[in-house]
Amino acid sequence: MRVVVVVTGLVVVVVATALSLPDHDVKSASSPLSSSSVYQGSSGDDCDEGLPPPDRPFYVVWNHPDTCKRNRIPLHLDHYGFIFNKNRLFLGEEIQTLYNTGLWPNISETGEFFNGGLPQLFTHHDYSETVEILGRYRTENFTGLGILDFEEWRAIYDTNFGIMRKYQDESIKLAKQRYPSYNKKELTMVAEQEWDQAAREIMSTKLAIGQALMPGGHWGYYGYPRTWGSKRNTQLRNNRIDWLWRQSTGLYPSIYIKDPNMTESAIAEFVSGNVEEAVRVQDEFSPPNTPIYPYAMLQSGDHIFFQVDHLKISLGLPAKMGTSGVILWASSNRYKNATRQCSRMRVHIDNVLGPYVENLTQVMADCSTTLCGGHGRCVHNSHDVLLGETDSQRLSGLCTPRHSRFRDYHCRCYSDWEGACCQTVRPSRCHKQQQGNVHEGGDLQEGHVVNVVNPLIG
């Protein structure tokens, strides 16, 4: 089964059809086109058209509460080229990090089940609250970053460990009720299959609703993808949710450094690992040009601001690896003492962060223009997960003299360009079909239809 979310003049309709959704052999995903068309993706070999290319290769996006503006302590973000919402709002036309996206099944710390507790028992399949809530934040002609942030449980069954282990345990109990004669191994297999399918239905449908309400946005989930130990385990697990990468039009891994005692080498390994995996799944599964924006922080747990050495890792390293930018996020808890925090933040921006961001974004833009004709991003030879060391060395220097400051970089072209220097227009073999504004999502029960009036359109 698959979900189709249709936006008509006055309603948002979530429909389940009996069509099977391919799991591994087809590269299909929604794309933010006009309000009357749909992107029909196929495999990477058959379809080269993707999302629109960016106007600059790298941005730093500000996603802090608007506390400083409300307290009349201005932060000079515009002086240094940050991207931010109008009036410094947390939710706006450039970025929306959404925590409340309607009903989700979850189990409280005391063991109380809400909305079924487990995805398998989720009883609110009309998703009307999700439509209503996302409708409140609907921005006309939204082309920014749309992020759904849900962290109570994870999409992959066996990644629910630690404090999330209760979801595995309760899923096995549920399976035992249905299959009392099964042994533990068999029950675990059933629990895993049922969990993965139900989690997919919920996550995919909520993502599809956001895409339908604001089709020009780059939609995805916070913290996806991430690493899971070894590279092999990471790839095997993340390949199990390839449906999410195919549907997402933005990838938002987390590179938060929560342990202030981590060494620089450990931090670099952590950051590069998560960014590498995002680059891999984007290349293998997502629509071409799907942006990657890791979430990063400016302060450690004890409120000490990170200095340039750390910024070179949390901002500079993702830039070298070819991401679209980095989102700088902070909780409202950081601003409980607003006057002190905002005053310190302004000093940090003016003396450390701002000049670094301004220089970094300009360097990446200059490199793109010099090496790639503005038709791609520069990727450092030692940080390209998509190329082997020999390939990186072979490409190095093809587009710039050896004495150039960009001699250690090569081009990763946007989807409509190709060649070592992104100098050749790539013919597109995609076809835009006039089928209304449709976004395909995950599975629902056959015949299930939801017809919900959009509060902002109706």
UniProtKB/Swiss-Prot annotation:
* Disulphides: 68-342, 367-378, 372-411, 413-422
The active site consists of: 151
Task: Please list the tissues where expression of this protein has been recorded.
Answer: Expressed by the venom duct.
Q: Enzyme class, one word?
A: hydrolase
- A single GO cellular-component term on record: extracellular region
Family, as annotated: Belongs to the glycosyl hydrolase 56 family.
Protein name in the entry = Hyaluronidase conohyal-P1
